[in-house]
Amino acid sequence: MCGCRASVPSTKHYSVNPAPTTRSPPAAAGMPKRIPIAKQLASIKALEKGSDLEKAFATAALVYNNSADPEGKLSKAETKSLLQTQFSRFIQGQENKPKYQEMISALDEEPEKKIDFEDFMISLVSLALLSDLLQEIKNVKSTK
């Protein structure tokens, strides 16, 4: 046999318009399913009776760790993407602020350069401090 499709007996023949499938994208195929952050957080015994602040910090650390490479670092490009997807409500409306533009430009420079957790948290807190959402949070009443 020549190896062409018509002469190979074990070759499956597909229609021109195959039915859509619900399979995972090829990049995710074979990858273990990620455990939700809430379940990861719940599995940390020391935080069973943790304060809201402790749990908030642990959540930020878990989000970072789930995206970091085996050495515990993120590229600047990955950092920018993570902040834009996981911190979008804090970033919203900041696009024209000079400090925000400066921070994003710094992430765009040498996008493959790696940053550690400390630098990530500094970026996270800096973006939160710039945010219009922070003022809204400050205005929330904590008592009746």
Curated annotation (Swiss-Prot):
Tell me which domain of life the UniProt entry assigns to the organism this sequence originates from. Answer: Eukaryota
* Residue span of region Disordered: 1-31
Keywords, ordered alphabetically: Cell projection, Cilium
Q: Where in the cell is it found?
A: Cell projection, Cilium
Say where the protein is mainly found: other
Cite the GO molecular-function annotations of the record.
Answer: calcium ion binding; calcium-dependent protein binding; transition metal ion binding
Cellular component GO terms held in the UniProt record:
cilium
Report the SMART domains cross-referenced here: S_100
SUPFAM superfamilies assigned: EF-hand
InterPro entries, alphabetically?
A: EF-hand-dom_pair, S-100_dom, S100_Ca-bd_sub
**Bias-annotated ranges (Low complexity):** 18-29
Gene3D superfamilies, alphabetized:
EF-hand (1.10.238.10)
Q: What does this protein do?
A: May be a component of the linker structure that bridges the ciliary membrane and peripheral singlet microtubules.
Q: What else is known?
A: 'Sentan' means 'tip' in Japanese.
Name-wise, this protein is: Sentan
Organism the protein comes from: Gallus gallus
